[in-house]
């Protein structure tokens, strides 16, 4: 990141009824340690809540953390809610227990990348840095 760019703004969301958030909290800390501005939604977010938070926080990246197995039903609804908020330029990534057989289908929906358990945090940070939409720094 150069001095002419603002820090990357990331929203980490826990959609659906998934009540396990340790991995999401570890990721939030890693992204913050890497110099990113991170908003964590907390548990039990609806697709509309995720999209509204992404719009209100003016994020460049939305990370969806899911362990419940409901990714095939939740992800399309979240992507549609983001489109309704006119957030077509936001990078959407996902992580959690997404079976390898579902990864191609999830990416086909519009999820840019899927990070499964065991993915090194440095790899996630590097991916976000390389793919987040660039925004100019706010004038002083």
Predicted regions and their residues:
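Short, flexible coil/linker segments at domain boundaries that flank nucleotide/cofactor-interacting
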Residues: 3-7, 87
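N-terminal pre-triad scaffold of radical SAM enzymes
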Residues: 13-17
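Cofactor-cradling patches in redox/metallo enzymes
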Residues: 24-126, 133-134
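The C-terminal output helix
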Residues: 130-140
């Amino acid at each position: 990141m150069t001095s002419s760019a603002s820090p990357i703004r990331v929203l980490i969301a826990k959609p659906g009824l998934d009540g396990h958030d340790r991995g999401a909290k570890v990721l939030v800390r890693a992204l913050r340690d890497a110099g990113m501005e991170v908003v964590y939604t907390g548990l039990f977010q609806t697709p509309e809540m995720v999209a509204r938070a992404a719009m209100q926080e003016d994020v460049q990246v939305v990370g969806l953390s899911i362990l419940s197995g409901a990714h095939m039903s939740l992800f399309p609804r979240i992507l549609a809610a983001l489109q309704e908020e006119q957030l077509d330029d936001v990078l959407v990534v996902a992580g959690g227990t997404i079976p390898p057989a579902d990864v191609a289908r999830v990416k086909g929906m519009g999820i840019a990348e899927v990070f499964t358990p065991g993915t090194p945090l440095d790899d996630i940070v590097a991916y976000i840095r390389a793919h987040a939409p660039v925004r100019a720094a706010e004038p002083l």
